Design a protein with these regions (language model features):
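Histidine- and acidic-residue-rich, metal-dependent catalytic cores
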Residues: 1-148
């Protein structure tokens, strides 16, 4: 039986560069998004995802917050509690990220994982407020890894 830790994923250098820029923009330590991509890959393997589906999940993990970077709002990096208006504005970032992923030529699957990576099982997430099994497993896996 193959260990879920033993298989290290290989990531596209362009996506790693985008992830590094997003990590720096948000004030995360270097390699934050790569670690999340490795985590979702391990979880995808544990859930018996096909290699192609694991690749989509890895790609989504690397570009999940590109929408925040493209919004380029100072409050994202402020470290303070956001106002109601700022929170509402920030909730647009998954849709902006979905559009950016499309412009980059990433698959529709990656685009949708990026769009739904802030959805919650109880329907309180954003941008669409979908709930339960309406949220694809890949998006749920990314939500957990990103929160962890």
């Amino acid at each position: 039986m193959q260990s879920i830790i033993s298989e290290k994923p290989r990531f596209d250098e362009k996506l790693i560069s985008i992830a590094a820029d997003a990590d720096a923009f948000e004030g995360y330590s270097a390699g934050h998004s790569v670690r999340i991509a490795e985590m979702v890959d391990s979880l995808g393997l544990a859930f018996n995802f096909e290699p192609h589906d694991r690749l989509l999940l890895q790609q989504a993990a690397l570009v999940r917050n590109i929408g925040e970077m493209q919004m380029n709002r100072d409050y994202i990096r402020s470290g303070r509690v956001l106002s109601s208006e700022e929170r509402l504005d920030l909730q647009r970032h998954p849709v902006i990220g979905e559009q950016a992923a499309a412009k980059m030529g990433l698959s529709r699957g990656v685009q949708l994982i990026v769009r739904w990576h802030h959805e919650w099982w109880n329907g309180s997430g954003y941008p669409d407020g979908i709930e339960g099994d309406q949220i694809p497993l890949a998006a749920r896996i990314l939500r957990v890894a990103d929160t962890y």
